[in-house]
A protein has these predicted regions:
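Glycine-rich loop/hinge motif
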Residues: 13
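Peptidyl-prolyl cis-trans isomerase
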Residues: 16-133
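Acidic/polar surface patches and capping/hinge elements
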Residues: 1-9
C-alpha cells in the first residue's frame, strides 16, 4: 500500500549580487498569476542564473518533505547545495514559502537565490489531498 507523501517542485535563480536578485524579484512579482511567474522565472533563470539548472529553467526537481512511512525518519539531501535545501525545507515547514510565491533573496555560498515552489503534491497543509500543478 502506498502511503502519504508530501513533495514540492522547486525552481530558482542564483546571481552574485543581492541587488540583482532584488530587481529580478520585483520583476517576477509584477506578474499577477502563479503560472505566469513560473514562466517568467524560467526565462530569467535561462538568461541570468549562475546555476547549471538554468538550462532547464532553474528546475531543481522534486523534494520530498514528508511521508507517513514509519521506515523513513530522515531524508537524504536532494540538492547539491544542502544549505539551500535546508532553507527550503524550513520555509515550507514554517509556511513562509508557498506555491507560486517568490521567496528570497537567500544567500548561500553560491550566491543569492530566488526560490519558487511551482508544484506541490500531497500537501498536508489542508484537510484535502492536493496535487496542484501551476
Amino acid at each position: 500500500m502506498v502511503g502519504f507523501s508530501h513533495q514540492i517542485q522547486v525552481r530558482h535563480i542564483v546571481v552574485d549580487k543581492k541587488e540583482v536578485a532584488e530587481l529580478l524579484k520585483a520583476t517576477l512579482n509584477e506578474v499577477k498569476s502563479a503560472n505566469g511567474r513560473t514562466k517568467m522565472l524560467m526565462r530569467l533563470a535561462e538568461k541570468y542564473s549562475l546555476c547549471p539548472s538554468k538550462e532547464d529553467g532553474g528546475n531543481l526537481g522534486w523534494i520530498e518533505l514528508a511521508s507517513d512511512d514509519p521506515r523513513i525518519t530522515e531524508y537524504d539531501p536532494v540538492l547539491k547545495n544542502v544549505e539551500l535545501e535546508k532553507v527550503i525545507r524550513q520555509g515550507v515547514r514554517d509556511f513562509t514559502m508557498k506555491v507560486g510565491e517568490v521567496f528570497g533573496p537567500v544567500e548561500t555560498q553560491e550566491g543569492f537565490h530566488l526560490i519558487l515552489i511551482t508544484q506541490e503534491f500531497g500537501s498536508d497543509r489542508s484537510t484535502a489531498f492536493t496535487g496542484s500543478a501551476l
